[in-house]
């Protein structure tokens, strides 16, 4: 098994960045979802509500990022705000970037603000984690791993149903592996996985939502692959595709993983 691709999403819900190599921090890949657009109530806005976010291209730079050509500095002295990634999630404190308010509001066509997670220690992982595990603005876990063979299985179901196959981008993974049998990742839960020279804990399966129906290049919304997952991959935990990982590295440490490196499920 090998790593076939690596991806980050600098702003939650935005278009992906593809990488040949990525630095692993305790809370995920470097630069992944440290920013989030929120509504006036401080709740995150994602592609669930705003598929237009597929057209938001965010590129990190030292001390900030560039959004579709609009430069935003990290608001180190920006106002602190109590936010929620989802309305039902616990609150956390992050800083707002007032200079970006007009830009993100115009982009979405609704009132919105841009938040930056300066301190990753403020958001603990709720379940299937160890004390001290933290996550950025990702849904719940630092990384999502998917398998090309499992995608092939989904696309076989789609073709049988008379639908077009979908690319892996629909599932917005961080790490994609090749060389494992379809659904082998189901058996890795509760174990450790080594990607290159870095070890991760396989925390839980990933329950999928309507974002999988959003074309990540056009923002158009359809019905698949969520309908196929509902028919073939429905479990008590939801409609499952991919697994959530937690880096098994100490606070303050970083490591690097690269496309082409081997991957191995450990005992």
Where are these regions (language model features)?
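Metal-cofactor-dependent catalytic cores
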Residues: 1-267
């Amino acid at each position: 098994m090998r790593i076939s691709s690596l991806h980050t999403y600098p702003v939650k819900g935005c278009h992906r960045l593809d990488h040949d190599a990525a630095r692993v921090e305790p809370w995920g890949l470097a630069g992944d979802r440290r920013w989030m657009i929120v509504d006036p109530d401080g709740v995150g806005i994602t592609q669930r509500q705003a598929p237009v976010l597929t057209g938001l291209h965010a590129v990190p730079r030292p001390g900030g990022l560039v959004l579709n050509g609009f430069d935003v500095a990290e608001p180190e002295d920006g106002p602190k705000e109590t936010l929620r990634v989802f309305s039902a999630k616990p609150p956390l404190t992050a800083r707002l970037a007032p200079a970006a308010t007009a830009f993100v509001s115009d982009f979405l066509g609704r009132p919105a603000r841009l938040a930056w997670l300066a301190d990753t220690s403020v958001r603990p992982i709720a379940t299937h984690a160890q004390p001290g595990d933290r996550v950025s603005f990702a849904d719940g876990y630092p990384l999502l791993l998917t398998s090309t063979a499992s995608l092939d299985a989904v696309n076989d179901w789609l073709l049988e149903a008379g639908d077009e196959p979908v690319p892996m981008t629909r599932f917005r993974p961080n790490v994609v592996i090749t060389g494992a049998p379809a659904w082998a990742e189901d058996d890795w839960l509760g174990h450790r996985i080594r990607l290159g020279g870095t070890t991760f804990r396989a925390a839980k399966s990933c329950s999928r939502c309507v974002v999988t129906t959003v074309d990540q290049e056009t923002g158009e919304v359809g019905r698949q692959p969520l309908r196929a997952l509902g028919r073939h991959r429905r479990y008590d935990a939801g409609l499952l595709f991919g697994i959530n990982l937690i880096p098994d590295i100490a606070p303050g440490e970083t490591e690097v993983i690269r496309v082409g490196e081997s991957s191995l499920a450990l005992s």
